[in-house]
Design a protein with these regions (language model features):
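Conserved functional hotspot residues or short segments at active or partner-binding sites
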Residues: 354, 361-434
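PDZ/PDZ-like peptide-tail recognition elements
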Residues: 88, 100-138
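Low-complexity, intrinsically disordered tandem-repeat tracts enriched in small/polar residues
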Residues: 1, 13-20
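Cleft-lining beta-strand/loop regions that shape enzyme active-site pockets
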Residues: 47-61, 65-82, 135-138, 144-152, ...
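Terminal targeting/pro-maturation regions of precursor/exported proteins
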Residues: 2-3, 23-101, 134, 412-413, ...
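Active-site/binding-pocket entry motifs
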Residues: 109, 207, 229, 279, ...
């Protein structure tokens, strides 16, 4: 075959064009990888501010990441979506720190801001992550989620068809909030059932129920606290005074399924029972220790107290329980709590993405991070109401559930409250011992 000069020139042009295209792709990958490496090191080395030796370790990890990215680019079965790979890496990086830390892409951050400023209505439930999915820690009694049939410990498999496994907790919260009267559809999973069930929830401004108060037998005053909004500690103080006027000689403080509110209200509530000692303290790597100590002038009762907790006890309620337990002020009865107590910082990035980063944790008086260790009662008693309702154990893998709306019909009536009964027994024994 005869090859002319013109043919050779054309062939060389094609080869040159192909090389340029290849170089362009490599350059694009290199730029993305470099950008991600810089961002990763900023997070690992800058925000965390580790020592030089640790920085060397961070550099080594970035080298490994660069090698992995190179292998993906060169050997993956098809040309990869590098932007998707890096986005997934950033989400995974932040979410591997703790449930409350999140990476929001520019699009996600825009949506997050819109939902946060678009309305204060939500579903009336505290939601965290479990098994990698969004999970209901506790619902507010009488709130939208409760009325729709959502239950404590439900796994939210998806929101509006979007898997919660694929999004950050911040995005979950954004999706669940919105305008008053708007609806959101969630698919929930419960144990020992066939399939996830869809529940439609009408968002609303959630009113926290008032503190429950009543007198029980043997001069026991009973208080039920569903959440810790601003001013809750003052309401609790008033209820304690009312119970004492009614002749209460002992107090049961029920914090089961109390999972939301302001940590400051938890501190103030604990102080009602303590005249000395540390209630809690905040601390982070770059967050100086901030101790919250009991103020003797704010202690209003010396009555024996027993605190009820379960897996739905989180946040401010855990601060109260840990303070009373570790200052030997009273007994904690029930299940191990959820474990949630930290402070987050929103950090906007140059590309309009954002990080939500945990910068400090709340610690019990003895130095246990509440978010990591939770609060273990000194008197462990399984929640008989949850066992009767068929809710999963802490380590039990969830499975799909019954149809929504069946909650009120299927929930057992007159369930014996083993935890409350044990609290009454503990208080009686303490009284007999003088």
């Amino acid at each position: 075959m005869k090859i002319t000069v013109k043919d050779c020139s054309l062939e060389r042009a094609k080869i040159k064009k192909a090389k340029i295209k290849t170089m362009s792709t490599k350059l694009k990958v290199t730029v993305i990888a470099s950008s991600l490496a810089i961002l990763l090191f900023t997070i690992v080395g800058g925000f965390v501010n580790v020592r030089a030796s640790s920085n060397d370790g961070a550099y080594r990890q970035l080298s490994v990441y660069s090698e992995v990215l190179s292998r993906i680019r060169l050997e993956y079965v098809e040309e990869p979506n590098i932007a998707g790979v890096t986005d997934g890496a950033l989400h995974g990086l932040l979410e591997s720190l703790d449930a409350n830390s999140s990476y929001l892409s520019p699009e996600e951050y825009k949506h997050y801001k819109t939902m946060k400023t678009g309305g204060k209505a939500d579903i009336g439930a505290t939601v965290s992550k479990r098994f990698g999915y969004a999970a209901v820690v506790a619902v507010i009694p009488g709130g939208p989620a409760d009325k729709a049939g959502v239950e404590n410990s439900d796994i939210i498999e998806s929101i509006e068809g979007k898997s919660t496994h694929d999004i950050s907790l911040a995005e979950v919260h954004a999706l669940l909030s919105g305008e008053v009267g708007s609806t959101v559809t969630v698919a929930v999973v419960r144990p020992r059932r066939a399939e996830p069930q869809k529940i439609v929830i009408a968002r609303n401004i959630v009113a926290i129920p008032p503190v429950g108060e009543k007198m029980l037998a043997d001069n026991v005053g009973y208080l039920q606290v569903d959440a810790f909004p601003e001013g809750e500690s003052q309401e609790i103080a008033g209820k304690i005074r009312d119970l004492q006027k009614q002749g209460a000689k002992k107090i049961v403080l029920d914090l089961r399924n109390s999972a939301s509110g302001a940590e400051s209200e938890g501190v103030a509530t604990a102080n009602l029972f303590l005249d000395h000692g540390t209630i809690t303290y905040l601390q982070g790597q770059k967050y100086p220790r901030q101790a919250f100590n009991a103020d003797p002038s704010k202690d209003i009762t010396k009555l024996p107290v027993a605190v009820l907790v379960n897996r739905g006890t989180a946040g401010p309620a855990e601060i109260v329980a840990a303070a009373i337990l570790e200052n030997a002020r009273g007994d904690i009865i029930g299940d191990k709590t959820f474990g949630d107590g930290s402070v987050q910082k929103l950090i906007e990035m140059p590309d309009n993405s954002a990080l939500i980063l945990s910068i400090a944790k709340y610690y019990s008086p003895s130095g246990k991070a509440i978010q990591d260790a939770a609060v273990t009662p000194n008197v462990l008693v399984a929640d008989s109401t949850e066992e009767e309702a068929g809710l999963p154990d802490e380590d039990e893998q969830a499975a799909p559930s019954e149809k929504p709306g069946d909650k009120k019909d299927e929930k057992p009536k007159n369930v014996q409250d083993d935890q409350l009964n044990k609290a009454l027994e503990v208080l009686k024994n303490r009284e007999s011992k003088g």
